[in-house]
């Protein structure tokens, strides 16, 4: 099974979310279902239907989190080199198409946040820059149009 590469912070968030589901949300939804059953006929019971739908969504999220927690690798545990771009690296790149410099951090898919310039290794840009060295020019292959970037500096 594939591993999820996540940060320690994201791991802690997932553990807290799972704990809240198991200790707070699941008992609450179980109580809602019990109360709805006591109302009688379940065939036309909107409260029961809503609670069942919420329970299904909660179970799906619980299963997703458990899958991640059973198959993760911490970013901090991945061997990093300052000679080449790897997960956790912060780099300055120059995008030739946009005539624009930017600083990005390469992260696992669970930690990506494009608005904070945290780019997943699984994106076209992430795949293009990983294992590259300072000064490398790479082509980023996207569905729309490929473009070139230069790795100006590996900051961290």
Curated annotation (Swiss-Prot):
Belongs to the GreA/GreB family. One of its GO terms (molecular function) is RNA polymerase binding. One of its GO terms (biological process) is DNA-templated transcription elongation. It holds the Pfam family GreA_GreB_N. InterPro entries: GreA/GreB_C_sf, TF_GreA/GreB_CS, Tscrpt_elong_fac_GreA, Tscrpt_elong_fac_GreA/B, Tscrpt_elong_fac_GreA/B_C, Tscrpt_elong_fac_GreA/B_fam, Tscrpt_elong_fac_GreA/B_N, Tscrpt_elong_fac_GreA/B_N_sf. Necessary for efficient RNA polymerase transcription elongation past template-encoded arresting sites. The arresting sites in DNA have the property of trapping a certain fraction of elongating RNA polymerases that pass through, resulting in locked ternary complexes. Cleavage of the nascent transcript by cleavage factors such as GreA or GreB allows the resumption of elongation from the new 3'terminus. GreA releases sequences of 2 to 3 nucleotides. It comes from Ureaplasma urealyticum serovar 10 (strain ATCC 33699 / Western). The lineage of its organism: Bacteria, Bacillati, Mycoplasmatota, Mycoplasmoidales, Mycoplasmoidaceae. This is Transcription elongation factor GreA. Keywords: Coiled coil, DNA-binding, Transcription, Transcription regulation. It comes from the Bacteria. Residues 1-84 form a coiled coil.
